[in-house]
Swiss-Prot record:
The lineage of its organism: Eukaryota, Viridiplantae, Streptophyta, Embryophyta, Tracheophyta. Pathway: Photosynthesis; C4 acid pathway. Residues 1-71 form a transit peptide. It comes from Arabidopsis thaliana (Mouse-ear cress). The modification Phosphothreonine is found at T107. Keywords: Acetylation, Chloroplast, Cytoplasm, Lyase, Phosphoprotein, Plastid, S-nitrosylation, Transit peptide, Zinc. The modification Phosphotyrosine is found at Y198. This is Beta carbonic anhydrase 2, chloroplastic.
Amino acid sequence: MVPFWTTVSRNGSSDSETTLQSASKATKQYKYPSLRPSHRLSLLFLFPFHLSANGACFRCTCFSHFKLELRRMGNESYEDAIEALKKLLIEKDDLKDVAAAKVKKITAELQAASSSDSKSFDPVERIKEGFVTFKKEKYETNPALYGELAKGQSPKYMVFACSDSRVCPSHVLDFHPGDAFVVRNIANMVPPFDKVKYAGVGAAIEYAVLHLKVENIVVIGHSACGGIKGLMSFPLDGNNSTDFIEDWVKICLPAKSKVLAESESSAFEDQCGRCEREAVNVSLANLLTYPFVREGVVKGTLALKGGYYDFVNGSFELWELQFGISPVHSI
């Protein structure tokens, strides 16, 4: 048996020294306008047919490699490559009917796979289907709820949660529309009061506390948080490698310092787990730098709570920031 990409004569002899020349000659004979030269050569080298000495028996041994190469070519050149290969295999004298039949079968399989892949995810269709499902199963079945929401909102909670796609607070805590005023960001952090650097967060807190009159602010951390991992990994030399992320997660540097001081010898994963919770406490303390939050806590109209969602083990922890004023002592 000799590989197809070597020169095969009618009497079965081969010349391995002319391998590249033969492949190049074949690719020049059958032009693929939309393929790069490297793809043209790979059509032959990744699709080896083996011939017997008399050229009468064919066996393809590398279909999987060929499939990968076709997918790499992209959608525009796919059909051209298929047609060119069919022409090459069907018209070339050395290839018999069994090879042509085999190619037709492979072609059908590749086309079916390509069609399936191209239809696997349509972002616009996914959004359409999602809204249709929501409207049918929730909106239209709860006219009273959505009728009230059309008049305004009065949520009991303000929630700070991470932007991580795995930890949507409405999903995790089964909140309904109107239950929670939600702010999501990297690592669920609350920065200290700063009208310049953190005006967006300040505006959200001010609106929730003074206008919506929320009764609870909950900061929820979570397991395997990428933001906290970054905080624990980034160097403290001031040389940032990111435009925004490092400056943002440094909000909770006190949490990192506390964890390193208390568990310097622990494994990095354990340190991150401790910091995920400790960063929540830093954010709770930062909330007290907002005058209207502090006033609400002192008056008892506002409670600050910390939470931690472990999606690996399916557990949730909740704790409350205790705040009090010591009695006045006359001296």
